[in-house]
């Protein structure tokens, strides 16, 4: 996709989100489906997905367009795949499994594992709760990886939750209870499950999740760019020990830079960097500061 189309698509996505009621502000999927036509899908919390068509020339928005081959359909789904995502050239799909990042070739169905340290507290390409809820947004469905336009690289966030406090969340649904017949407080990227004898196996359960309250430790974040042809990961030149937030990243049209937004935890300064997928070095692009805070 050329730069003109990228800019048009960005403007269209922003305008549709701004003018529509009850939208999440990020579409869950979008794709060019004609020379001047963009298809978008938005998630609704209670009523499901809704499709739109946007004409890039006239700006006309049409609701309820259903294309014969919905662009979120997949030819197959690898076992355990989470956030299955097409490459821009439609020859591969990326996904996470067991908190590691994978890619699968559509023609051969051959899978390649790209990260290897995923665990209950190390999440590769899958958001820690605070990033899902407060930064990347719920419409991402915890997805924290991004294909390059040339389909040769994937940028991703690696979250270390080991210092984030564990917080219990009660679920009223019986299907969330431990199948063994005991009440169980079980882990959602939290570490170990904890038996709770007074929890009814048919009346609900308690989920333990990594949840940073105000002043608690946030997850440490590293930003990786993996070359899917040779498996090499270049790590962006940021200190993961800094108390900071990274916003939603984006690729340059030439796939030569991965653009990262960074803020300190006080959120009164915003810096934009271009990160090299070759060695992870960063170039400062933009700086903004405000006396209170920046969104």
PLM regions with names:
Residues 9, 18-295:
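Beta-propeller folds
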Residues 1-6:
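Positively charged n-region of N-terminal signal peptides that target proteins for export
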Residues 13-14:
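Repetitive helical segments and hydrophobic/amphipathic motifs
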